[in-house]
Amino acid sequence: MSLRSTTPLLRAVKRPFRVVATTAILGYGFPESSFRAAMAEGPVDLIAVDAGSIDPGPYYLATKSSFTALEHVVRDLRVMVQGYLEYQGPGPRPKLVVGSAGGCGTNNQVDILAAEVRRLLFNLGGRELSEAIPIATVTSELFTPAATLAHKQLVPLGPQPGGDTGRADLEPNANAVVVAQMGMEPIMAALEEVDIVLCGRAYDPAVFAAEPVRQG
């Protein structure tokens, strides 16, 4: 996918692009005082966090479930959304990006995350403000993985063997759950339109790199 930004470069006078990265994985927690101190240090262009990991194994992808407790995820989101809403500048509010919703990045986990963010916007900012702030969701689940991946070569990311996706064991399976790991481009496209972007399975650095690359 090629993407050419139509947004003018936002910083004619160069200054450091400032990112507040809250924690290693959404739901793992971070001190609210540290977050507030970081937000107060100067201009903030982006608040971002990744929520995914392959470390827990394939169970959570297969069951479309999260390996982090929802109450812990919502706690982290509350601090981030509140920081976004209360930002006093200079400049516009920062963008807010979350990658690999629920850890596995399936579409239902993106929907859960979006519902919680909308609820937080309403609770923290009221109906009028919450309705004025759109949220973009970028999904990554493949509903026809056999057709999408047919006769392509699988390249392993580690010591596992690769394979030819034309094999019979990759034929359509009603129980199969496959997500494609996105890079920067779909996140950049969403950031052209909105401040808050919630993603399915994403390459960890993409959630941090998309906005500075978009701005040039």
PLM features per residue range, with description:
Residues 2-157, 167-181, 186, 190, ...:
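Metallocofactor- and cofactor-centric catalytic cores in central/energy metabolism, strongly enriched
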